């Protein structure tokens, strides 16, 4: 199932012009720590002879396993900037490692699937619409395997920051981190944290929560609700705080309206979306599945303007990431998907005796040359055992070479036959022209 999901995502990403890359698994501590408060997630590496002496080396100089694919991307872009065409659109599907406590939906080692667009100097806002639509399109393809409909919930950091500053709050990053916990711990606990850790009054905390309650499906509705909230809390329209918030509001309204014109209902404005990591500077996204509230977000990301730079040149970007292993786990255990094939082969060529194996291999090679995935029985066991072997691997067809009929005492020479072991149908077949049923041959493979 995981491989089929990977293939589906890759197909959609490449249809939209994204280029696949792979980066090394190991990065320096300095690179890994660029993303903010992530030290607890990093697995550091040591040579055996260094065990017990790790403290002699600063964390920034040590090596660690990457915990996401954005930090390696920023290094890759800087190192290869002279050879890349910007904006650089990349997809990457690779394993990452995090210091998680293993539990359902949380893994220490898992596969992540990312798409990002990186600009040189600047990056047009329209990519902030394009990327969530690409992800929605990819997730829509996975509905064939039981995944529910996905909706992207978007916000903009500038909108939130301007509003918080308009209230008189100064610890904007702290407020964003606490608001990011809203779905996990609830409004009362977030309000308490805002007052205790961010210096907010009870009235300011309530206003922050009121902002987080705002949702809208179009730009006009969003602007009307936001302006009413600003007026209620005394944030005037000619203030610097409102001007900053309005920049974010205009971008968010553009995203929602343009997404609605292309794929209605795929993206909504949801002002509780905060994304706790410090490096996001504009749009932020979380993606939720219909009827799967307990699962939480399955795809997240946002705009970052300051993650990568080279001298005076900055490389702003926008990206989205799917925790693919977590998504596949949900599909297998909750969404009703199932992996009914272990082998990618569509055909198993039977072997009646070892003297006939060369003939079986020739048939297999002719089928493979025509693009039909084929395996050959490992031993010349009884026919029933060979069919059971194919069934255990989920191989839907068993090919009987002509030598089967010829080897039977008193039988006339006959042509090859192929049996669909799912339906029981058995027909004459020629390996130069026979085609498997595409539905049967392409059923889900790879657990």
PLM region descriptions:
Residues 45-49, 55-65, 309:
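Conserved phosphate-binding loops in nucleotide/dinucleotide-binding enzymes
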Residues 20-51, 250:
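A cross-family signal for N-terminal binding/gating loops and helix N-caps
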Residues 131, 156-159, 175-178, 190, ...:
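Internal, well-ordered alpha-helical segments in soluble enzyme and binding-protein domains
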Residues 41-55, 167-201, 289-291:
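Acidic, His- and aromatic-enriched active-site or binding-groove loops in soluble protein domains
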Residues 4-17, 27-30, 38, 58-60, ...:
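Positively charged, Gly/Ser-enriched RNA/tRNA-binding surfaces
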Residues 151-168:
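Glycine-rich, mobile lid/loop segments that gate access to catalytic sites or pores
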């Amino acid at each position: 199932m995981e491989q089929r999901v990977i293939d589906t995502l890759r197909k959609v990403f490449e249809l939209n012009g994204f280029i696949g890359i792979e980066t090394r698994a190991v990065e320096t501590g300095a690179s890994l720590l660029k993303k903010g408060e992530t030290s607890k997630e990093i697995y550091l590496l040591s040579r055996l002879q260094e065990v017990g002496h790790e403290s002699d080396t600063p964390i920034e100089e040590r090596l660690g396993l990457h915990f996401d694919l954005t930090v390696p991307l920023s290094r890759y872009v800087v190192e290869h900037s002279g050879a890349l065409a910007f904006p650089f659109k990349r997809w990457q599907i690779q394993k990452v490692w995090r210091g998680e406590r293993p539990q359902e939906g949380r893994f220490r080692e898992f596969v992540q699937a990312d798409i990002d667009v990186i600009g040189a100097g600047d990056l047009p806002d329209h990519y902030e619409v394009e990327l969530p639509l690409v992800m929605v399109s990819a997730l829509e393809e996975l509905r064939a395997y039981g995944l529910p409909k996905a909706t992207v919930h978007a916000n903009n950091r500038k909108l939130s920051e301007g509003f918080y500053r308009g209230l008189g709050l100064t610890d904007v990053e702290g407020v964003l981190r606490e608001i990011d916990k809203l779905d996990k711990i609830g409004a009362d606990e977030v309000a308490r944290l805002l007052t205790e850790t961010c210096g907010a009054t009870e009235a300011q905390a309530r206003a922050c929560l009121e902002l987080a309650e705002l949702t809208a499906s179009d730009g006009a509705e969003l602007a009307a609700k936001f302006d009413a909230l600003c007026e209620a809390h005394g944030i005037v329209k000619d203030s610097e705080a409102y001007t900053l918030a309005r920049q974010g509001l205009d971008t968010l309204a553009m995203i929602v309206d343009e997404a609605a014109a292309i794929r209605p209902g795929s993206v909504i404005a949801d002002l509780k979306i905060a994304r706790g990591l410090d490096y996001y500077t504009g749009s932020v996204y979380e993606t939720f599945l219909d009827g799967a509230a307990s699962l939480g977000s399955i795809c997240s990301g946002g705009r970052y303007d300051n993650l990568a730079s080279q001298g005076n040149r900055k490389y702003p970007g926008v990206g989205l990431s799917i925790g693919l292993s977590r998504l596949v786990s949900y599909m297998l255990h909750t969404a009703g998907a199932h992996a009914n094939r272990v082998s990618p082969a569509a055909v198993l060529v039977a072997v009646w005796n070892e003297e006939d194996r060369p003939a079986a291999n020739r048939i297999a090679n002719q089928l493979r040359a025509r693009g039909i995935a084929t395996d050959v029985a490992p031993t010349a066991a009884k026919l029933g055992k060979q069919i059971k072997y194919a069934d255990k691997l989920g191989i839907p067809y068993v090919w009987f070479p002509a030598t089967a009929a010829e080897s039977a005492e008193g039988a006339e020479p006959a042509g090859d036959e192929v049996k669909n072991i799912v339906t029981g149908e058995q027909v004459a077949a020629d390996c130069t022209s026979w085609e498997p049923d595409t539905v049967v041959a392409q059923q889900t493979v790879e657990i």
